[in-house]
Swiss-Prot record:
Protein name: Small ribosomal subunit protein uS2
UniProt GO BP: ribosomal small subunit assembly; translation
Record PANTHER family: 40S RIBOSOMAL PROTEIN SA (PTHR11489)
Recorded name of the encoding gene: rps0
Function of the protein: Required for the assembly and/or stability of the 40S ribosomal subunit. Required for the processing of the 20S rRNA-precursor to mature 18S rRNA in a late step of the maturation of 40S ribosomal subunits.
Record's subunit section: Component of the small ribosomal subunit. Mature ribosomes consist of a small (40S) and a large (60S) subunit. The 40S subunit contains about 33 different proteins and 1 molecule of RNA (18S). The 60S subunit contains about 49 different proteins and 3 molecules of RNA (25S, 5.8S and 5S). Interacts with rps21.
Keywords for the protein's UniProt record, in alphabetical order: Cytoplasm, Ribonucleoprotein, Ribosomal protein
């Protein structure tokens, strides 16, 4: 990391540098835009361009000072058409008071005053100059300054402040937006001192896949009781109703005895029926025979 050109109070801590490296903010693309060459540290043997983390931090502080200089936070517009940055811009807007455009940028937002979504911001911040090219183009028409998260292959035309970082990873995008929001709040005085920790976790700025969250909830609901525990005791505890089944088995024996009694009752009916019915037809036969002979 090159020596910092900032005042000592703005120097990053070792934890800040570790977070930038852990989120892979220093890993750029294989292509290199000529205007991004000053932010390049070196090129790896596999062709990946490595970004100078010191330059990244300097540009984060510079962008935060520009944002804090605007009196009305609602005059700042943060934009992200890239899905990995949509959650980050919404959180940034919630914490700093800016206006967020997450998702598709409607053409004419800055130039067509007839539309309902017409805006006149004093500053815009975009996640990727390539995916947010329409917003940058319209900002150039109406002289709006642009701050952008730029990778080594990002076009820098009409970009006033480029923050060199990896703008394709979910963690790198979320971390840079989180650091930018924290620095803005520090300059505004919302955070008491630079030594004080911000109570907002960086995880809130990371992208989350809705389908993955739904699948995770479905898996947790489908788990059997005791499946998370280890050992035979957990399984026995999970199927604690086995004793109830044994009791019901005893009850089933009572039902078996009752069915045997019913079967015995059926046998007595069978025994009674042949004697009664066999005797009755015989008697009837004798009466008919007797009456017939008497008449004849």
């Amino acid at each position: 990391m090159a020596p910092s050109q900032l005042p000592a109070i703005f120097n990053p801590t070792s934890q800040d540098i570790e977070q930038l490296l852990a989120a892979q903010c220093h890993l750029g693309a294989k292509n290199l835009q000529v205007h991004m060459e000053p932010y390049l540290w070196k090129t790896r043997p596999d062709g990946i361009n490595v970004i100078n983390i010191g330059k990244t931090w300097e540009k984060i502080v510079l962008a935060a000072r520009i944002i804090a200089a605007i009196d009305n936070p609602a005059d700042i517009c943060v934009i992200s058409a890239r899905p990995y940055g949509q959650r980050a811009v919404l959180k940034f807007a919630a914490h700093t008071g800016a206006v967020a455009i997450a998702g598709r940028f409607t053409p004419g937002n800055f130039t067509n005053y007839i539309t309902r979504s017409f805006k006149e911001p004093r500053l815009i911040i975009v996640t990727d100059p390539r995916t947010d090219a329409q917003a940058i183009k319209e900002a150039s028409y109406v002289n709006i300054p642009v701050i952008a998260l730029c990778d080594t292959d990002s076009p820098t035309e009409f970009v006033d402040v480029a923050i060199p970082t990896n703008n394709k990873g979910r963690h790198s995008i979320g971390l840079v937006w989180w650091m930018l929001a924290r620095e803005v709040l520090r300059l505004r005085g919302s955070i008491a001192s630079r030594e004080a920790e911000w109570d907002t976790m960086v995880d809130l700025y990371f992208y989350r896949d809705p389908e993955a969250e739904e699948n995770k909830e479905a898996i947790e609901e489908a788990k059997a009781p005791g499946a998370d525990e280890v050992g035979a005791a957990a399984v026995d505890q999970g199927f604690a109703g086995a004793g109830d089944w044994e009791v019901s088995g005893a009850t089933a024996g009572a039902f078996t005895a009752a069915s045997n009694t019913a079967a015995a009752g059926g046998a007595s009916w069978d025994a009674a029926e042949p004697s009664d019915w066999a005797a009755a037809p015989a008697a009837a036969g004798q009466e008919w025979a007797a009456s017939g002979t008497e008449q004849w």
